[in-house]
Swiss-Prot record:
Alphabetized Gene3D superfamilies for the sequence: Erythroid Transcription Factor GATA-1, subunit A (3.30.50.10), Retinoid X Receptor (1.10.565.10)
Region Hinge, annotated ranges: 108-145
Highest taxon of source: Eukaryota
Span of zinc fingers (NR C4-type): 41-61, 77-102
Cellular component, GO annotation: chromatin; intermediate filament cytoskeleton; nuclear body; nucleoplasm; nucleus; transcription regulator complex
Family: Belongs to the nuclear hormone receptor family. NR1 subfamily.
Tissues in which the protein is found: Expressed in liver, colon and small intestine.
Name recorded for this polypeptide: Nuclear receptor subfamily 1 group I member 2
Species of the source: Homo sapiens
């Protein structure tokens, strides 16, 4: 079959054979459906599938042209100095002449869509196809009524128990010079080898977590606390009472949050206690992330601001301190409030916490919250950029679980040297003695 000259093309040919990538909004049509029978590729003579980048071509030449243009390849003819005949059999032998033939045929680089645009285009076509067939996936149809009620209950619990302005956090201790009553134990003034080893580990724990604090008064005054440069003695404990007060305030909110949730109240009291003991720290960090400013590396808790001091220098600190890295990575996901509360629920209802009796019930509840989170993401974030968001969130929860274990060990070591935990902290973390 001969190739029709360009002058013989009519308007109908162009309208009905446009390529998906070349003209947004109009699907490509198979060349066999054209009036007049099958068409051939203007580049190599193979069977054409439609208009691609302004020219009737086969799928092979379409893909070749896209790849060559995206690579900005500089091709040279190894045979006849740019005069190779391009056919179906020879098209793979000389890329330079094949590209020349594509351009001479009228294929246009500017009609190539970006990878992101192609993904969005495919998603749109898939969505429209689903609408026509009436077989939409759950995420597109929307959440079930049960899932919507579940999210509403969690959001209501969050609103009732978490004040992001921290206006009720008033009765707290501020760091200062420790009184004589807080001197180091006599055993550490002349420590044994065992006590010296404990002291060394505690210093390591605290020195890696130097926290600066800023308090803004209602009259506009500002009070700053900076950790001492040389933490060789008792001054490294100066901020512990304040941090214990803040932690206790947050833990009380977490307990109230859990008690508002009907699924939690339906569990035996023994399981409620076990779940709270295991998840309190994790839920606390998820709430802290909502007030974390990634640009300044600061937790903005109303009039109080906390910042981890950079003891390692530059970006290294981000790698050395898992807690800080976690907050940066989670904040980068730009989660909705609904996604935060669902994360809290998934963390709270973990069936493998020590002491949990009704493993199966708790496991089913956790699965329901996880499925609801996945459905919420599919419904509210259809863009291709968010297709892995659910997996990223679940990975962050796994990382938080690991940080929780490290935090508990660190807290117990510090408590052993310098008791500072409040009664509620002692109860949650299983601290039996002072």
């Amino acid at each position: 079959m001969e190739v029709r000259p360009k002058e013989s093309w009519n308007h109908a040919d162009f309208v009905h054979c446009e390529d998906t990538e070349s003209v947004p909004g109009k699907p490509s049509v198979n060349a066999d459906e054209e009036v007049g029978g099958p068409q051939i590729c203007r580049v190599c003579g193979d069977k054409a599938t439609g208009y691609h980048f302004n020219v009737m071509t086969c799928e092979g030449c379409k893909g070749f042209f896209r790849r060559a243009m995206k690579r900005n390849a500089r091709l040279r003819c190894p045979f006849r100095k740019g005069a190779c005949e391009i056919t179906r059999k020879t098209r793979r032998q000389c890329q330079a002449c094949r590209l020349r033939k594509c351009l001479e045929s009228g294929m246009k680089k500017e009609m190539i869509m970006s990878d992101e645009a192609v993904e969005e285009r495919r998603a749109l076509i898939k969505r429209k196809k689903s609408e026509r067939t009436g077989t939409q996936p759950l995420g597109v149809q929307g959440l079930t009524e049960e899932q919507r009620m579940m999210i509403r209950e969690l959001m209501d619990a969050q609103m009732k128990t978490f004040d992001t302005t921290f206006s009720h956090f008033k009765n707290f201790r501020l760091p200062g010079v420790l009184s004589s009553g807080c001197e180091l134990p006599e055993s550490l003034q002349a420590p044994s080898r065992e006590e010296a080893a404990k002291w060394s580990q505690v210093r390591k724990d605290l020195c890696s977590l130097k926290v600066s604090l800023q308090l803004r008064g209602e009259d506009g005054s500002v009070w700053n606390y900076k950790p001492p440069a040389d933490s060789g003695g008792k001054e490294i404990f100066s901020l512990l009472p304040h941090m214990a007060d803040m932690s206790t305030y947050m833990f009380k909110g977490i307990i109230s949050f859990a008690k508002v949730i009907s699924y939690f109240r339906d569990l035996p009291i023994e399981d409620q206690i076990s779940l709270l003991k295991g998840a309190a720290f994790e839920l606390c960090q998820l709430r802290f992330n909502t007030v974390f400013n990634a640009e300044t590396g600061t937790w903005e808790c109303g009039r109080l601001s906390y910042c981890l001091e950079d003891t390692a220098g530059g970006f290294q600190q981000l790698l050395l301190e898992p807690m800080l890295k976690f907050h940066y990575m989670l904040k980068k996901l730009q989660l909705h409030e609904e996604e935060y509360v669902l994360m809290q629920a998934i963390s709270l209802f973990s069936p493998d916490r020590p002491g949990v009796l009704q493993h199966r019930v708790v496991d089913q509840l956790q699965e329901q919250f996880a499925i609801t989170l996945k459905s919420y993401i599919e419904c509210n974030r259809p863009q291709p950029a968010h297709r892995f968001l659910f997996l990223k969130i679940m990975a962050m929860l796994t990382e938080l679980r690991s940080i929780n274990a490290q935090h508990t060990q660190r807290l117990l070591r510090i408590q052993d040297i310098h008791p500072f935990a409040t009664p509620l902290m002692q109860e949650l973390f299983g601290i039996t003695g002072s």
